[in-house]
């Protein structure tokens, strides 16, 4: 967990702020929008080029979450994707990588202070989700990351595959 949090922090500091699309581009990752049917997105590393492909039919919030998640795969699991293996075939078999990418995404997209501020008005993950505009599963990952940092939030089980 420590490595994921440190990696997310360094990515934000080195490549940009909370605009995940700009951050990805600044990090040298090409972000493309395509029609992908039921697939929300995938990451690919091929011929020393890095790509995040996002379903153009998603709403803007989901596009951002998918981009942050796939950027997590780039920053944490790049070597697992060598040779053009796409997320829908590689990462479904390994929940650890999905969990790590989701934790990374939560750190990239949601500042701790936003959670702490929203808690003055919200008493549940569902309400935090509505207040902050992110999926409740991503909020859960953020709370888990904050617990690792020393906060004490009650957590329920989180699905690794909420972006599938």
Protein language model features and the residues they cover:
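Active-site hotspot residues in diverse enzymes, especially metal/ion-binding acidic/histidine motifs
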Residues: 1-164
């Amino acid at each position: 967990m420590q490595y994921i949090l440190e990696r997310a922090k360094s990515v934000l500091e080195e490549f940009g702020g909370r605009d995940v699309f700009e951050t990805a581009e600044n990090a040298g990752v090409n972000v493309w929008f395509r029609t992908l049917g039921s697939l929300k997105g995938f990451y690919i590393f091929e011929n020393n080029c890095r790509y995040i492909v996002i379903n153009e039919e998603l709403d803007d919030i989901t596009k951002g979450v998918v981009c942050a998640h796939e950027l997590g795969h780039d920053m944490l699991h790049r070597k697992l994707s060598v040779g053009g293996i796409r997320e829908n075939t590689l990462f479904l078999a390994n929940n650890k990588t999905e969990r790590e990418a989701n934790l990374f995404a939560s750190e990239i997209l949601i500042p701790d202070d936003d959670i702490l501020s929203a808690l003055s008005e919200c008493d549940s993950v569902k309400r935090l989700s509505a207040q902050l505009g992110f999926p409740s599963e991503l909020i859960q990952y953020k709370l888990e990351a904050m617990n690792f940092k020393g906060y004490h939030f009650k957590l329920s089980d989180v699905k690794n595959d909420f972006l599938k």
